[in-house]
Amino acid sequence: MYGTITEKTNTVATVYDYKKDIRLSVQLIRWMMEMIGTWPKSTMTSSIERYAYTLLNVICIALISFLVVPAIIYIVLEMDNGYLILKLSGALSFCVLAIVKYFSLIFHKEDIRNGIKYIESDWINTRYYSDRITMIRSAKFGQHLVAICMFFMYGGAVFFYLALPFSASKITEDEGNLTYQPLVYPVARVIIDVRHSPVREIFFWMQCLSGFLAHSITASGCSLAAVFAMHAYGRMEILIQWIEHLIDGRKDLCDNMNERLAIIIEHHVRILR
């Protein structure tokens, strides 16, 4: 149970573990964003940790570029079938957008950090029992949305990068002397010939890693929006409860109606930020 109370009849939560509540709100999205190096670090982070985080960002961008650049060169130099070009362009556009989203997450780290601070502050300052229940319900629903997003994104990645290549028919060339399975993202032969082993296997697993990274970036962006939206929704529900008690008051609210109205307006402005 979140928010331990001293008496069941007491509606004001006097003893609670707000850190546990904060983890409930952000634990999944934090795990996912730390994995790709976009979770905002504390201002007290050491220089070594910052350099390590920057290195992780460079590696992630390089891995996604590993999918895009060879495939674009392949389209320009070796493809002449309009349908196949259009088909491959759809997959490439997903990777290009993943790079754009990744840079967006990096450049907006300060905004994300401020959003997380708002969540932490709201949990710390929420003491009324019914308000905390509303917050917990919204946080749990937000985590369910994150889990659903992760399921579909990673499920699609498994199908596209693992199931689809293994189910595809093998290609036979050189009068039957060479047989191989095509990669999800073709590589121009001017770069390297991936038809032979073990080059093909290396590129296959590198593409799988890069693909899962691209899906992680997309899932992180969607999940972050879900977490913030559900937190704001929970605060709006609390605001509605405060408005309902504007006239008659409540144990945790001010005795003066004008002061209660001022608090409600201030809280509403805070939500809109």
Predicted regions and their residues:
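Alpha-helical transmembrane segments
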Residues: 98-109, 218-232
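Internal catalytic or translocation cores that form aromatic/hydrophobic pockets or channels
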Residues: 109, 115-134
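Helix-loop-helix junctions within predominantly alpha-helical proteins
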Residues: 5-88, 125-229, 241-255, 259
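Intracellular effector-coupling site of seven-transmembrane GPCRs
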Residues: 256-273
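Generic preference for well-ordered alpha-helical elements
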Residues: 89, 109, 113-116, 155, ...
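Central hydrophobic cores of alpha-helical transmembrane segments in multi-pass inner-membrane proteins
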Residues: 67, 95-99
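Membrane-cytosol interface segments
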Residues: 2, 11, 94, 103-111
